[in-house]
From Swiss-Prot:
Pfam family, one: Gemini_coat
Name of the protein in its database record: Capsid protein
GO molecular function: DNA binding; structural molecule activity; zinc ion binding
Task performed by this protein: Encapsidates the viral DNA into characteristic twinned ('geminate') particles. Binds the genomic viral ssDNA and shuttles it into and out of the cell nucleus. The CP of bipartite geminiviruses is not required for cell-to-cell or systemic movement.
Cited InterPro entries: Gem_coat_AR1 (IPR000650), GV_A/BR1_coat (IPR000263), Viral_coat (IPR029053)
Chain location of the short sequence motif Nuclear localization signal per the record: 35-49
Span of the annotated motif Bipartite nuclear localization signal: 3-20, 195-242
Cell location: Virion; Host nucleus
Family: Belongs to the geminiviridae capsid protein family.
């Protein structure tokens, strides 16, 4: 008379064969060769020429990867007369934050930070607006021109600033934005957050020097102008400015 099967044999999915197959340490080491995956992930030299010459839209025309990044972290004292900083200062080198040669393309600009007031200034009843201009200098020379030299204003008011007529072919305002802070004892807004991301595709050209300075630019320097509307109460801006750029293939 045959013995009766054990109770665990009648349970679905718990046979001895399946238990050995599932929990064996060698069960997960069997790899099946997938021809479709191998064809999709084939190396570049085995692809047609169109795949080797075509570049994705993420890479600007005439450039090559990888995407490099440079950060400018600084606290700015913004006054009524304005200030300027160059955000295309890239030193020549081999790192992920360096340019390979004379030419590169700034694909995008990311500005992150806040506008804030001093402890003594925020107690005064006033409203102060801080304005930013992202400007392209097509023919940089010497040192960056001051805010009052580039912009024409009515009654020295930065909110009415426009590029002077004789400099319109050299300076081009690519983007403009502002942030507002309010001081006072009751309805005060002592700080304002700043967050902007722009796609610019600005092709920068340097001379033979390696240092990342404005004076070494020959074409298309990126400048950030800042000014506040209040004449007597300055504000502070704690900003992290990141630019993402690609090296040119003609370097």
């Amino acid at each position: 008379m045959p013995k009766r099967d054990a109770p665990w044999r009648s349970m679905a999915g718990t046979s001895k064969v399946s238990r050995n197959a599932n929990y064996s340490p060698r069960a997960g080491m069997i790899h099946k060769f997938d021809k479709a995956a191998a064809w999709v992930n084939r190396p570049m030299y085995r692809k047609p020429r169109i795949y080797r010459t075509f570049r994705s839209p993420d890479v600007p025309r005439g450039c090559e990867g990888p995407c490099k990044v440079q950060s400018y972290e600084q606290r700015h004292d913004i006054s009524h007369v304005g200030k300027v900083m160059c955000i295309s200062d890239i030193t020549r080198g081999n790192g992920i934050t360096h340019r390979v040669g004379k030419r590169f393309c700034v694909k995008s600009v990311y500005i992150l930070g806040k506008i804030w007031m001093d402890e003594n200034i925020k107690l005064k009843n006033h409203t102060n607006s801080v304005m930013f201009w992202l400007v392209r200098d097509r023919r940089p020379y010497g040192t960056p021109m001051e805010f009052g030299q580039v912009f024409n204003m009515f009654d020295n008011e930065p909110s009415t600033a426009t590029v002077k007529n004789d400099l319109r072919d050299r300076y081009q305002v690519m983007h403009k934005f502002y942030a507002k802070v309010t001081g006072g004892q009751y309805a005060s807004n002592e700080q304002a957050l700043v967050k902007r991301f722009w796609k610019v595709n600005n092709y920068v050209v340097y001379n033979h020097q390696e240092a990342g300075k404005y004076e070494n630019h020959t074409e298309n320097a990126l400048l950030l102008y800042m000014a506040c509307t209040h004449a007597s109460n300055p504000v502070y801006a704690t900003l992290k400015i990141r630019i993402y750029f690609y090296d040119s293939i003609t370097n």
